[in-house]
Amino acid sequence: HQFLKRYKSTVPTVIIGNITAGGTGKTPFVIWLANHLLNKGKKVGIISSGYKASLEIPTLVTGSSNPSLVGDEAVLIAKKTNCEVVSCGNRVEATKFITKTRFFDILIHDDGMQHYKLARDYEVVLINNKKLFGNGLLLPAGPLRELKSKLDTVDIVAYTNNNTKPY
């Protein structure tokens, strides 16, 4: 992915994602991480992909936003955190939008692992420890969005669905 021209935000960017299709708990992890950073005194901005959203432009999300317009995950994040949340499938435009008139110590992108047009400072991959990598094959033959070797390049690998705290 080195050949792609990437947009680099002036704000440190954390990507939360996975390498498999299906749920790994990315949104709950984003909520936990955002609240943890807020408790440490950090100003956090969050970008959500707006999955199943009808709006295609960067949109500021509140807890009372219409989920059909901005995506249900974005509304949930806005309700569960005291962060500014922007919903948009175009992560570069969403990043530009949220940082244009606001200051943040850190940006968190929910489900942004495969969006390589956006440079990232940190990558966190979540793995469902009950499903792991399925049959080990890439989509559509298996559940992998990327090769398992991606795990060698990320900053943190966290296993979910194991009933441990803090997440």
Model-predicted segments: where are they?
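Phosphate/Mg2+-binding loops and adjacent switch elements
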Residues: G50-Y167
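Walker A (P-loop) phosphate-binding motif
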Residues: Q2-G63
